[in-house]
Amino acid sequence: MKLLPREKDKLLLFTAALLAEKRRNRGLKLNYPEAIALISAVILEGAREGKSVAELMDVGKNVLTRDDVMIGVPEMITNVQVEATFSDGTKLVTVHDPII
């Protein structure tokens, strides 16, 4: 299977997000890369499902709470930017302060 670099990046992101989700379900607190991966994957999947940029900006704020991540992670993640493919093209989705 031949993948473009962008496709490889998405595959790596989803692999990290699956691992993060499993760890969260086991009660482990997520670190910085795991939190970014999980939020990003939710945004990408939402775009695939047909949600709008505005909807995904709201969804991105409800993926994780402070209780889900290690100490200091919410302060490290001031925003998450994901380039997602929508039915009408590729758009940048920015979620400000995603971990409440």
From Swiss-Prot:
Keyword set, alphabetical order: Cytoplasm, Hydrolase
Q: What chemistry does it catalyse, as a reaction equation?
A: urea + 2 H2O + H(+) = hydrogencarbonate + 2 NH4(+)
Location (main, coarse): cytoplasm
Question: What does the record give as EC number?
Answer: 3.5.1.5
Q: Pathway involvement?
A: Nitrogen metabolism; urea degradation; CO(2) and NH(3) from urea (urease route): step 1/1
Q: Which CDD domains match?
A: Urease_gamma
The intrachain disulfides are: none
Which Gene Ontology terms describe the biological processes this protein takes part in?
urea catabolic process
Question: What is one cellular component GO term in this UniProt entry?
Answer: cytoplasm
Name of a matching Pfam family: Urease_gamma
Family to which this protein belongs? Belongs to the urease gamma subunit family.
Q: Cross-referenced PANTHER family, in alphabetical order?
A: UREASE
> What do we know about how this protein assembles, alone or with others?
Heterotrimer of UreA (gamma), UreB (beta) and UreC (alpha) subunits. Three heterotrimers associate to form the active enzyme.
- Could you tell me what this protein is called? Urease subunit gamma
Name of encoding gene: ureA
